[in-house]
Amino acid sequence: MKIFWMNAPRWLSTLIYVGMGWLDRKDVLQWIDWVLAQDSEAEIVLHGVSMGAATTMMTAGEDTPEQVKVFVEDCGYTSVWDIFSSELKLRFGLPEFPILYTASATARAKAGYGFKEASALQQVQNCEKPMLFIHGTADDFIPYEMMGTLYNAKPGTNKATLTAEGAGDGCSG
């Protein structure tokens, strides 16, 4: 059985707001439960690209059933705060304050989460299962350096990196 998940509010999910992976992780956990209700012996691999990679890592920090065997993230970001901060600087030459602070407060009020809370970096620190980190060196959206930060945050030795030379965002695999 294969399930392909797309981070998208309303039409594929119970979400109203784009959760940048943070809200979406709860939907993924429900899909895992559904798969296991169909086949209790299923072996599950979670894989995501870009925002899907963040969703994968954010899910990895939750209590997942033993049937979830491995996580594969391809060009994910460390946190919502970090990726928005990077984009503000890179694309617009703007500082974090006041825009990012205001946007994070608005997200907390409307969607129930703040941008610093929505952290793949914090979640991978709770992951005991194997994880593969993939990133392209020519990614001009999510900084390549975030892969190393995420890799170093994951405890244990059951982890690996794969660098895709010259690949952009979402083109590593």
Annotate each PLM feature.
Residues M58-G114:
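Hydrolase active-site cap/lid region
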Residues L46-G48, D74, I134:
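Short beta-strand immediately N-terminal to the catalytic nucleophile in serine-hydrolase-like folds
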Residues T137-I142, D169-G170:
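Acidic catalytic loop of the alpha/beta-hydrolase fold
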Residues N126-E128, F133-H135, D139:
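Short beta-strand/loop motif that positions the catalytic acidic residue
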Residues Y151-S172:
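Catalytic histidine neighborhood in serine/cysteine hydrolases
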Residues G48-G52, T56:
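Gly/Ala-rich beta-loop-alpha elbow adjacent to hydrolase catalytic centers
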Residues P9-D39, E43:
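Catalytic nucleophile-loop/oxyanion-hole region of alpha/beta-hydrolase
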Residues A120, K129, P143-N152:
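Short alpha-helix in the alpha/beta-hydrolase fold that links the catalytic acid
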